[in-house]
């Protein structure tokens, strides 16, 4: 799957990112949101996580360029302008770096 340059912040392919502010909905979908270059980098480096997609501005894309070839055929990698993040997500994501990944199964033993 090639990188997808998003020119319209209302693009339907970004639907998952529109609801990241609704914690209960995100939890019910079984995903979590990673924000920021360091956190997303660690997520991409850790084989235990099933990453669904990335939403990056150009700067974040360049900062993660060394890792993206491993993921380019596996997940959608969306790029858009930093100014579009508030339109897409409802938040001023000034870092321009988000990932959606599968929430790990909760280990009930570790909760006790």
Regions found by a protein language model. Give the residues of each.
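Short, flexible helix/strand-to-coil boundary loops that buttress conserved ligand/catalytic motifs
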Residues: 44, 89-92
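Boundary-proximal intrinsically disordered activation/regulatory segments immediately upstream
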Residues: 1-67
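Short glycine-rich anion-binding loops that position phosphate/pyrophosphate groups of nucleotides
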Residues: 59-60, 84, 104
């Amino acid at each position: 799957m090639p990188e997808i340059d998003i020119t319209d912040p209302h693009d339907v392919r970004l639907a998952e990112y529109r609801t990241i502010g609704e914690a209960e909905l995100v939890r019910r979908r079984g995903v979590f949101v990673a924000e920021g270059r360091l956190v997303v980098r660690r997520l991409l480096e850790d084989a235990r996580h099933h990453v669904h997609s990335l939403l990056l501005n150009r700067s974040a894309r360049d900062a993660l360029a060394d890792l993206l070839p491993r993921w380019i055929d596996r997940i959608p990698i969306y790029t858009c302008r930093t100014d579009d993040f508030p339109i897409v997500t409802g938040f001023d994501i000034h870092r321009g770096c988000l990932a959606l990944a599968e929430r790990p199964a909760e280990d009930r033993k570790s909760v006790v």
